[in-house]
Amino acid sequence: MARVIRKKPFVRRRPCQFCLKRQAVTYIDYKNEAELVRLVNMQGKILSSRITGTCARHQRAVALAIKRARYMAILPYIGLIKKDRDEIAQDQQKVEVKKMEESVKSAEPKATAEATEESKPKRTRKAKTE
């Protein structure tokens, strides 16, 4: 009986997150803890480029940045406690929310806020008739 050889399904490689940015990142800052935490697993090991999707050039830069951050005691050599990782993620979300609010405030003129308040009809209660 003939053996059936099955092909592995083609899985598209994730694009490098550093190459996708408008200005390609040439230096990955070791002081940027929030970004480096995403590239390290719970045991503190550097995630492979196959998992993170980084290209070879940026993977080498990521490894160097993580090693520098460990040496400078920004990242621990062993894994982060889940509580610490959650706090870092929350801090990062707060920063992103502040950036979004600032961009909305700068884009939105003050007059439009007043105009939207005037255009809304005021709600009144109807008197009950018995």
UniProtKB/Swiss-Prot annotation:
Positions of disulphide bridges: none
GO MF annotation, one: structural constituent of ribosome
Compositionally biased intervals (Basic and acidic residues): 98-108, 117-130
Record's keyword annotation contains Nucleus: no
Keywords tagged on the record: Ribonucleoprotein, Ribosomal protein, RNA-binding, rRNA-binding
Gene Ontology terms describing biological process: translation
Keyword flag Lipid metabolism: no
Name by which UniProt lists this protein: Small ribosomal subunit protein bS18
PANTHER family per UniProt: 30S RIBOSOMAL PROTEIN S18, SMALL RIBOSOMAL SUBUNIT PROTEIN BS18M
Family: Belongs to the bacterial ribosomal protein bS18 family.
Superkingdom of source: Bacteria
One of the record's GO cellular component terms: cytosolic small ribosomal subunit
Chain positions covered by the region annotation Disordered: 98-130
Function: Binds as a heterodimer with protein bS6 to the central domain of the 16S rRNA, where it helps stabilize the platform of the 30S subunit.
